[in-house]
Amino acid sequence: MSFEVGTKCWYPHKEQGWIGGEVTKNDFFEGTFHLELKLEDGETVSIETNSFENDDDHPTLPVLRNPPILESTDDLTTLSYLNEPAVLHAIKKRYMNGQIYTYSGIVLIAANPFDKVDHLYSREMIQNYSSKRKDELEPHLFAIAEEAYRFMVHEKANQTVVVSGESGAGKTVSAKYIMRYFASVQESNNREGEVEMSQIESQILATNPIMEAFGNAKTTRNDNSSRFGKYLQILFDENTTIRGSKIRTYLLEKSRLVYQPETERNYHIFYQILEGLPEPVKQELHLSSPKDYHYTNQGGQPNIAGIDEAREYKITTDALSLVGINHETQLGIFKILAGLLHIGNIEMKMTRNDASLSSEEQNLQIACELLGIDPFNFAKWIVKKQIVTRSEKIVTNLNYNQALIARDSVAKFIYSTLFDWLVDNINKTLYDPELDQQDHVFSFIGILDIYGFEHFEKNSFEQFCINYANEKLQQEFNQHVFKLEQEEYVKEEIEWSFIEFSDNQPCIDLIENKLGILSLLDEESRLPSGSDESWASKLYSAFNKPPSNEVFSKPRFGQTKFIVSHYAVDVEYEVEGFIEKNRDSVSLGHLDVFKATTNPIFKQILDNRELRSDDAPEEQNTEKKIMIPARLSQKKPTLGSMFKKSLGELMAIINSTNVHYIRCIKPNSEKKPWEFDNLMVLSQLRACGVLETIRISCAGFPSRWTFDEFVQRYFLLTDYSLWSGILYNPDLPKEAIVNFCQSILDATISDSAKYQIGNTKIFFKAGMLAFLEKLRTNKMNEICIIIQKKIRARYYRLQYLQTMESIKKCQSQIRSLLVRTRVDHELKTRAAILLQTNIRALWKREYYRAAIGQIIKLQCTCKRKLILDSVNRKFMLMAAVIIQSYIRSYGHKTDYRTLKRSSILVQSAMRMQLARRRYIVLQKEVEERNIRASYGIGLLEEAIEFKNSFILNLEMLNDSYTRLTQLLQGDLSNIPSKQRQEYETIVNGYNDKISKLKTLQVEIMNTLNKKNALKERKKKQSSLIQSHMQSLAAIKGNKPSRLSDEVKSMKQELAFIENVIAQDFTTTYSANKNDKVKGLGIAGQQVKPKLVNVIRRESGNPDLLELLMDLNCYTLEVTEGYLKKVNVTEVNGDNVLGPIHVITTVVSSLVRNGLLIQSSKFISKVLLTVESIVMSLPKDETMLGGIFWLSNLSRLPAFAANQKTLYEANGGDEKDKLTLIYLNDLENETLKVFDKIYSTWLVKFMKHASAHIEIFDMVLNEKLFKNSGDEKFAKLFTFLNEFDAVLCKFQVVDSMHTKIFNDTLKYLNVMLFNDLITKCPALNWKYGYEVDRNIERLVSWFEPRIEDVRPNLIQIIQAVKILQLKISNLNEFKLLFDFWYALNPAQIQAILLKYKPANKGEAGVPNEILNYLANVIKRENLSLPGKMEIMLSAQFDSAKNHLRYDTSAITQNSNTEGLATVSKIIKLDRK
């Protein structure tokens, strides 16, 4: 090898495998070569060696790199330097350019793109490669398929396409597209043939989804990994028309059915039926989801990204229908698969030595029902085994682990039998045996999709068989490649020597010899007491010695492993499970149970197994076994022997056909699109034999060129006189071309052993093409240099002449320009200096002004600060003086208020007397006018109604006076003697006034009697009044001025009477009432007026007023006839707010007509009624009834506020102001009543709910933590969801909704905390952890519905956090003490006193902490034990902040059926 400076080469790299580099130094002194390489990553490597020829002695020497023209070649055998890095780089370069296929001689290397490349397999691509030679187009698997098809057509020989590679490399997809290509090839042009071809194509392609569903699974390396080998034969007749197809399968991975490692899955079909079956069928088969079954939930995540299992199920069932399996048979298959899932869920009980299984076990019953077998016998043979001797049958019990193995063996037996039956049914559909008898099948093309070499951390029986199959295929591949090389050399008649290549025959002999691994495994499997350990010891004694120890070895540690040196890598196998997997059998008892099945599909499957056993001849083993009875050799063959036999048959088929190879490569383990992992690809190239093929090619003549190609490429390497007459003469004979090629070779290559000239080609040893390319490049460089020299000389001569001419013309122009430029520069310089002077002066002046301004601002700020400090001190002094004056004047103001209260009482009495006298005078005038004008009887009636209200006010005033007198008498004892005498004098005068008031009361009673007489008179003269009213209407139409003026004056007088009485009596009564309730206020404070009617004469309706005055009528109708008869359970969305609509309608009418007294009494009666209804609700209706009435009652304050807003907007006279005062009182009073009803109901409801669902026991009871906690919480969450639904149903507004939830949590917080410190005998950190976990579950339900859940539970949360914290000393406790802000020291002490260590080794609460808490409590005078009381007035906020919403919702139409008076009021009010 030559390593001149500048030579490109490859150097080993730990992360990339190989990295490119360039020789930057090559020195030789003292017999040693000193090389220096600069790698592509910038690193420099120094190498010292004595020779460049022997690479084995110098493993660190770099490897020469191919010229760039050859690096992305589509055939690796054309590389000049055929070495490992050259092959890897060529594949990588093509892959990164989107070219996933590369030839390596007869092998097609296919790199998985992990991306959608559907354009590579379209119908147009199939047509492009049809009838084309392999080397005409880019590498493609269609080219391999076309080559196989053409070989079959022209050479009349059977073909085989071997697709191999590791899991995830794309074998299954490649095989699928090859099948599609063969199924799409059509030679016949007749219409009948096209129809038949379409049907066959569909059936052949339909086998793919079926085989993938039942034989593929998700693994860590591949989402769709084939877990079995498959050999598909597409059969052709003499006219190359597809006549059918046959499928052979090899070694289905049965263990995957019962065990899947993490992140892996069971076979796809189980997940497809669980997602795709209709719900009625799933219920019939008792199926739910993959996580519910042991056979599908071991791998974790059951879903595959981007895969719709329901859609895959549809594809699978359609494919089954296409190959002749009807819907009923499919349902039978799914029933068997469902039975397998239920078998995996069978649970056995474990005793000390045995396992037991009841025939009543639920999963057992379901599985036996689906399979149509007897549950008793099936359960029996799961936990028992039968040993047959010459004289008797012995039944023994199995231990728990053996019973599990027996259960899983049954499942594996059923699934493998189902898989074989499915393959046989597909073959019956795709292939008619009569075709062979009628000689219709002329040839076939086989597609072998088989597992690649596998090497995991733990390798078992499946990996052993897979690697054994790959050893056989690799041996056949090497022999095939060597055979092709020999044929090429013989055909070209060149001299060649025998090529040595690594033969893996010793490894194959180790496995399959008569005393090989498989034979010893079969021998041990046939022994009843055979075990994995015994078999391992036999392997060590048989093979751990020469010559077998070259391919077999024993690990340094352990007695349960052995190592086999395969062609790819040494693999360490675990012997555990080999014997059981090799036996692959179920008990005779289970077979007898299965034979009695009533499931027709299951019976067909078992019958098919018997036919397979009858058709397969038993393996004849003539070798005499020592210590093995003859009867044992007559048992059924083991799985290993069957696999060995089927593999031998497969190799026989392959050897009888012309083989084409496709090696699939997995470029990265993460399955990322278009990413290339060098180390991973290198390991696969070694494992699949590509590098071995290249080594065989390198041993011969890997590079070959035809004579014409060689001449066209390298003619430049000879003298012009030799190639000028040959290159342009197309009729030149072959001998002249060959002689010219010999001339080129003689002139360039001195060693004739480096090449051979054949009949049509020239063959080169490895590296010769690179050498010729280097010579050609150097020659081309020399020629280019000569051409460039001549062209550049001509170019620069012309350029020089043109330049000189231009220079002469430009010099004169430039000189004149320079003068002008110099003058212009001097002028501009002078101007610039002047301009700079002015600008700099301006800058300096501005800078000076800015500095002065900033200094002034700073001075102002400082002065302002000093003045403000002085003013603040003065204000503080003034404030202190004011506070002192207020404190000193408090006593004097108290005396003043006492005197003022007495004077107001006297003034009230005087005003009452004056009002009474004024009323008598006005009453007499009204009576005289009523006698003169009978048609004015209506106005008199209104005055009488006003008397009624006045009497009521007088009675209330009398009561107030009595109470005030008592109050004054109690206060006199505290007044000094001088003041007491003054008070007694005032009281005596006031008593005189009282006596006068009593006289006034008697006179009012007389007036009432007169009123009754007037009513009687009204009834007698009704006809007269009617006629007068008609006359009045007529007179009104004519508008007589005299009568109109008289009526108007009468109305004005009546209004004046009402105003005077209202003002006098209102002021008096309100003062008395205010004194009674709140005491005397500050002087000048506004006095609240007394509630009176403010009837509006101008807008009143006599009929409506008469109805509204009859308070008892409609009050009883609403309360007794409507509210108490509401059935909450029958309330729907249309009449949820019916009660509040009725109430607000009546109140609105009363307020609008000025009947404030009637409105107040009506509201009081309604509120009392609702309160009694809520308080008397039975326990089972507490939630529904309470929420219904609270939802309605909460609208009443909002209604009052809305009405108040309307009156405030309208402004108005004194009557409107009185109405506003009433509405304000109505809003406040209804809020208080609502708060009272709400608080009482909430406590009652929570007590009932707590007793019903055991909330506090659920959270705090330690026994529930391990037993029925989940069930209890499910009950709690069901209750809370129902509670939430009821709130929504009865249209509780969002703000009130949130308040109810918050108050509920506050109640729970108080009760849980009190129960924690009173009912729990002992506390520890485990208990605190469990309580905290339960509280978190409670919080998780409330958090999506309200904000700030945790502050409502702060006490109980902090209490359990205290239990969970480990506090070892007082310093730690002091650091944490401030974080428990919601608890006082007494409460913390109560919790810590109850703390008991959970374990023996755990320390209790240090005494210094308890002593510290005791001192804090003593210092702050706190009471023990710190129990929090449920004070609803303090704990539950007022509803006032939660009832701000639009009242339009209460104006909905409600059913007023049965409310005659209310309906009439509504009707008249609307008029």
Swiss-Prot record:
Entry GO terms, CC: actin cytoskeleton; cellular bud; cellular bud tip; cytoplasm; filamentous actin; membrane; mitochondrion; myosin V complex
* Source taxon at top rank: Eukaryota
Family matches, as Pfam families: DIL, IQ, Myosin_head
GO molecular function term, any single one: calmodulin binding
Binding residues for ATP: 165-172
Q: Name one GO biological process term.
A: intracellular mRNA localization
Domain Dilute: from-to ranges: 1164-1419
The Myosin N-terminal SH3-like domain covers 4-57
Entry coiled-coil feature ranges: 938-1063
Q: What happens without the gene? A: Abnormal localization of ASH1 protein to daughter cell, with protein mislocalized to mother and daughter. Decreases HO mRNA level.
Q: Does the keyword ATP-binding apply?
A: yes
Q: Does the keyword Membrane apply?
A: no
Among InterPro entries, the record links this protein to: Dilute_dom, IQ_motif_EF-hand-BS, Kinesin_motor_dom_sf, Myosin_head_motor_dom-like, Myosin_N, MYSc_Myo5, P-loop_NTPase
Identify the residues that the record assigns to the IQ domain, covering every copy: 781-801, 804-824, 829-849, 876-898, 899-928
Could you tell me which residue ranges the Myosin motor domain spans?
Answer: 71-777
Question: Which key words tag this protein in UniProt?
Answer: Actin-binding, ATP-binding, Calmodulin-binding, Coiled coil, Motor protein, mRNA transport, Myosin, Nucleotide-binding, Repeat, Transport
Gene3D superfamilies this protein is in?
1.10.10.820, 1.20.5.190, 1.20.5.4820, 1.20.58.530, Kinesin motor domain, Myosin VI head, motor domain, U50 subdomain
Q: Where is this region: Actin-binding?
A: 647-669
Principal localization? other
Its localization reads: Bud
Assembly and partners are described as: Interacts with SHE2 and SHE3.
So what family is this one in? Belongs to the TRAFAC class myosin-kinesin ATPase superfamily. Myosin family.
An additional note in the Swiss-Prot or TrEMBL entry is: Present with 2210 molecules/cell in log phase SD medium.
Q: What is this protein called?
A: Myosin-4
